[in-house]
């Protein structure tokens, strides 16, 4: 069994140059059951939720906004991420392992989706900061074309950042893990973990905290009946992200310290490995919540879902598909593309609930 930020294998003992063998067979057995069950659950819920987001956004004829572009790419990142989980489930419960190409490809797609999802969440917070705090100056920059260009840049960054995580991965026997050159064996795992901590958590948290803090300041300075709801939703986003990702990143940091011999005691090593498995599953399940807190909560997105539902009903019933926006919705769409005076949640959406 393996966790993604700890190259520890399926053997029942862990060996250390300065200590005796540490028995971890019971933890390996627990992890085999625990990870396989929860990987399957995360896959099922994450697949359904994010597929709904993609279908709703791509099937609507309504003009897209920069918000829609970012939500679509966030859903695609999460889909890429969860698509690898059945392979990891197979890896956890099977004794045969992967083919080398499958090992490398699965690891690559996993980390690209992993970093892509976090980067798009960060970009969404920056976009909201621009739409609300810098509303007057950002309206010309918040176009669909700008969203597409930014999204391509985010994908490129995700691939670049993910590369150190999978470039040395290969299948060795029954295990899919990092096979580092001798000169990098000591430093590369440390660099991987440090990169994950900084670029995958610390930097995004700092950016999100600053953006949403400034947004809340701006909301307090204006008069709007949706202000209280918007602030609650902002706090929900930050708190949920922090609660789901902090324990896992703490364990990655402790795993790094273990590489330097900070946990020579066998019981501490066992506890660390058990905690890493549990917190990893909690962190990964965040992709199941993204559709709920970033898309489904929005009034505009719920309209997308209603139109998608009508299309599906028409197809199932064998009726012609005629789904169009009513005049009131068309007018509302035009109004949503105008920046409100002092309180703009999205210059192209105007939807307070989308301020998540």
Curated annotation (Swiss-Prot):
| Topological domain spans for side Extracellular | 1-26, 90-105, 169-195, 254-277
Annotated positions of the Phosphothreonine modification: 347
SUPFAM superfamilies per UniProt: Family A G protein-coupled receptor-like (SSF81321)
Protein task: Receptor for the C-X3-C chemokine fractalkine (CX3CL1) present on many early leukocyte cells; CX3CR1-CX3CL1 signaling exerts distinct functions in different tissue compartments, such as immune response, inflammation, cell adhesion and chemotaxis. CX3CR1-CX3CL1 signaling mediates cell migratory functions. Responsible for the recruitment of natural killer (NK) cells to inflamed tissues. Acts as a regulator of inflammation process leading to atherogenesis by mediating macrophage and monocyte recruitment to inflamed atherosclerotic plaques, promoting cell survival.
Report disulfide bridges, numbered on this chain.
103-176
The listed locations are: Cell membrane
Please name the GO terms of the biological process aspect recorded for this protein, alphabetically: adaptive immune response; antifungal innate immune response; brain development; calcium-mediated signaling; cellular response to lipopolysaccharide; central nervous system maturation; host-mediated regulation of intestinal microbiota composition; immune response
Q: Identify the species of origin.
A: Oryctolagus cuniculus (Rabbit)
Q: Which CDD domains match?
A: 7tmA_CX3CR1
PTM comment text: This protein is not N-glycosylated which is unusual for G-protein-coupled receptors.
* Record-linked Pfam families: 7tm_1 (PF00001)
Q: Which gene encodes it?
A: CX3CR1
Record-linked InterPro entries: CCR1-9-like, Chemokine_CX3CR1, GPCR_Rhodpsn, GPCR_Rhodpsn_7TM
Give the transmembrane region(s): 27-47, 69-89, 106-126, 148-168, 196-216, 233-253, 278-298
The family note in this entry says: Belongs to the G-protein coupled receptor 1 family.
Q: How does it assemble?
A: Found in a ternary complex with CX3CL1 and ITGAV:ITGB3 or ITGA4:ITGB1.
Residue ranges that the UniProt entry lists as topological domain Cytoplasmic: 48-68, 127-147, 217-232, 299-356
Superkingdom in the source lineage: Eukaryota
Give the UniProt keywords, A-Z.
Adaptive immunity, Cell membrane, Disulfide bond, G-protein coupled receptor, Immunity, Inflammatory response, Innate immunity, Membrane, Phosphoprotein, Receptor, Transducer, Transmembrane, Transmembrane helix
Lipid bilayer topology: Multi-pass membrane protein
Protein name as annotated? CX3C chemokine receptor 1
Instruction: State the organism's lineage.
Output: Eukaryota, Metazoa, Chordata, Craniata, Vertebrata
Q: Does the keyword GTP-binding apply?
A: no
GO molecular-function term, one example from the UniProt record: CX3C chemokine receptor binding
Q: What cellular component terms from Gene Ontology apply here? A: external side of plasma membrane
């Amino acid at each position: 069994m393996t966790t993604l930020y700890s190259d520890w294998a399926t053997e029942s003992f862990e060996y250390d140059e300065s200590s005796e063998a540490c028995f971890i067979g019971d933890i390996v057995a627990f992890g085999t059951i625990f990870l396989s069950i929860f990987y399957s659950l995360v896959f099922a819920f994450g697949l359904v939720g994010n597929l709904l987001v993609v279908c709703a956004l791509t099937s609507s004829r309504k003009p897209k906004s920069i918000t829609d572009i970012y939500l679509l790419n966030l859903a695609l990142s999460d889909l890429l991420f969860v698509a690898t989980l059945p392979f990891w489930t197979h890896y956890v419960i099977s004794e045969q392992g992967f083919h080398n190409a499958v090992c490398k490809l699965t690891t690559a797609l996993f980390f690209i989706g992993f970093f892509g999802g976090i980067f798009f969440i960060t970009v969404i917070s920056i976009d909201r900061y621009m739409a609300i705090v810098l509303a007057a100056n950002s309206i010309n920059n918040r176009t669909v074309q700008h969203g597409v260009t930014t999204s391509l840049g985010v994908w490129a960054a995700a691939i670049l950042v993910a590369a150190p995580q999978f470039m040395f991965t290969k299948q060795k026997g029954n295990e899919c893990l990092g096979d580092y050159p001798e000169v990098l064996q000591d430093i590369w795992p440390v660099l991987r973990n440090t990169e994950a901590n900084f670029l995958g958590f610390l930097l995004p948290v700092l950016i999100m905290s600053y953006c949403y803090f400034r947004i809340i300041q701006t909301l307090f300075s204006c008069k709007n009946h949706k202000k209280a709801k918007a602030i609650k939703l902002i706090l929900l986003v930050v708190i949920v992200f922090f609660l789901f990702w902090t324990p896992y990143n703490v364990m990655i940091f402790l795993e790094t310290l273990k590489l330097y011999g900070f946990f020579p005691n066998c019981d501490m090593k066992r506890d660390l490995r058990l905690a890493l498995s549990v917190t990893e599953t909690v962190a990964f399940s965040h992709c199941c919540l993204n559709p709920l807190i970033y898309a489904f909560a929005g009034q505009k997105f719920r309209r997308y879902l209603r139109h998608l539902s009508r299309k599906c009903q028409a197809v199932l019933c064998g009726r012609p598909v005629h789904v169009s926006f009513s005049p009131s919705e068309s007018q509302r769409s035009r109004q949503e593309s105008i920046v409100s005076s002092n309180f703009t949640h999205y210059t192209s959406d105007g939807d307070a609930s989308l301020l998540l």
